[in-house]
Amino acid sequence: MLVISIVATILVSCTTETENGGFSLEKVNDTLYNVVLETDSSRDVWELRFPVYRFCTGDMDGDSIVDAVVGVEKTTRFDPVVRRRVFMFRNIEGKVRPLWMGSRLGRPVVDFNVVNVDGETRLRSVEEDDNGKFLVAEYRWSSFGVKFIRYICRDFEFDDSMEILNNE
């Protein structure tokens, strides 16, 4: 149980809210994680049967309720290659429910973070560009899924892109 607590603490480090909205991540084993939502009166779990590389929280859809953003490594029906994907979950009356189960962003995802830009919560990602270099892009929620906003940088080396992701 101590290992679960340590993993959750490390992965929650990109939280943009002062509180995580009751969301946390429990590692059961290398390929089984639980997105957990705890309120004063209930505990709900959404099982993820994939490796998780990132866990963040923030009000992604602008409804003033904190959402969970989870990076998973998996295939999809239309892409048989294991890649990094981004899933979003919301709190519906104390239950964990999918908000968006994204198969990809603009380019293959390397990593992401949840950031606050001028009072708006956004998804910021490092993606691998077609030329083998890396870019940092920003997305916002748009009715069903995320909408591209802007490139923060393009044609950067991996380390430089990750530094921008983690320091802005």
Language-model features, listed with the residues they occupy:
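Beta-propeller-forming repeat regions
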Residues: 13-168
